[in-house]
Design a protein with these regions (language model features):
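Composition-driven recognition of glycine/serine/threonine/acidic- and proline-rich low-complexity segments
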Residues: 2-193
């Protein structure tokens, strides 16, 4: 596999994209929880799946609570959002109701749909987030379970979610196969300029 080389300028573009994408879902998240919600990108890292255990941006080596689904459209892939189980439950309780697991899936799916919509916008094509499901396992196991090729690029974004005086840390993972990387980076760079 060719070593992953993403320039500083490209990382800045990626950071800007994910910050804008996360902001897309803030109003919907506020509607679900009944309080202002701010999502801030704190760090982003791009790593080949084969190197993720050594170099990837990971919330925890232990069990995490995540929502994972397929990214369909011009650039197919997988997208997920993970939190510590206690934080996932706390976030879900902000939404109220009798089904905290369902609330967590709804909240995470809303945030991931914002990323999907933003990606569809820069790729000038359809993008859909489908098959959202709750996953509880270590992040590496979650990513490997996708059966993506080892050269798949994992764009990991550490997020700070502020809602109702609670601050939660989450990590989003977007898996894009190597063969689509140039297309994604070109579209993001064009949208940035």
């Amino acid at each position: 596999m060719t070593p992953l080389k993403i320039s500083t300028e490209q990382m800045i573009v990626l950071h800007g994209f994910f910050a804008e994408a996360a902001a897309v879902g803030e109003d919907e998240l506020a509607g679900i929880t009944g309080c202002d919600t701010e999502v801030e990108v704190q760090e982003i890292r791009a790593t080949a799946l084969s190197d993720f255990s050594e170099r990837g941006l990971c919330l925890s080596d232990d069990l995490v609570a995540g929502v994972m689904g397929r990214l369909e459209g011009r650039v197919p892939g997988t997208i997920s959002l993970v939190l510590e189980p206690e934080d996932a439950l706390l976030w879900a309780r902000l939404a109220g109701g009798d089904d905290p697991l369902g609330a967590f899936v709804l909240l995470a799916s809303t945030l991931l749909q914002g990323v999907t919509d933003a990606l569809g916008g820069v790729l000038d094509g359809d993008a859909a987030f489908e098959g959202a499901r709750l996953v509880e396992e270590p992040e590496l196991a979650m990513l490997v379970a996708t059966h993506a090729p080892s050269d798949t690029i994992v764009f990991s974004t550490q997020l700070r979610i502020d809602a109702r005086d609670e601050v939660l840390t989450a990590v989003s993972h977007l898996l894009v196969e190597w063969k689509y990387l140039a297309q994604v980076m070109s579209a993001l760079s064009a949208a940035h300029h």
